[in-house]
């Protein structure tokens, strides 16, 4: 994931910072506990495409 892109994208729910999870290929919003998929290198920043983080992921 391009670090320049991470500097300008934001969570569509709260406008918070997103963090790239390289293992799962997702952008994670820790404030909302949501993970947005990255498909073919393109972030899918749609709330209905996000998945809730598990309890373990929240505390990682």
Curated annotation (Swiss-Prot):
One GO CC annotation: cytosol
Coiled coil ranges: none
Superkingdom of the source species: Bacteria
InterPro entries attached to this UniProt entry: Trm112-like (IPR005651)
Database matches in Gene3D superfamilies: 2.20.25.10
Endpoints of the signal sequence: none
UniProt xrefs under Pfam families: Trm112p
PANTHER family hit by this protein: PROTEIN PREY, MITOCHONDRIAL (PTHR33505:SF4), ZGC:162634 (PTHR33505)
Family, per entry: Belongs to the UPF0434 family.
Protein name, entry field: UPF0434 protein YE1549
Organism encoding this protein: Yersinia enterocolitica serotype O:8 / biotype 1B (strain NCTC 13174 / 8081)
Source species taxonomy: Bacteria, Pseudomonadati, Pseudomonadota, Gammaproteobacteria, Enterobacterales
């Amino acid at each position: 994931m391009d670090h320049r892109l991470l500097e300008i994208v934001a969570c569509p729910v709260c406008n918070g910072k997103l963090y790239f999870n390289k293992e799962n290929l997702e952008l994670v919003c820790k404030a909302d506990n949501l993970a947005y998929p990255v498909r073919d290198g393109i972030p899918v920043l749609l709330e209905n495409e996000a998945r809730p983080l598990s309890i373990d992921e929240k505390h990682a």
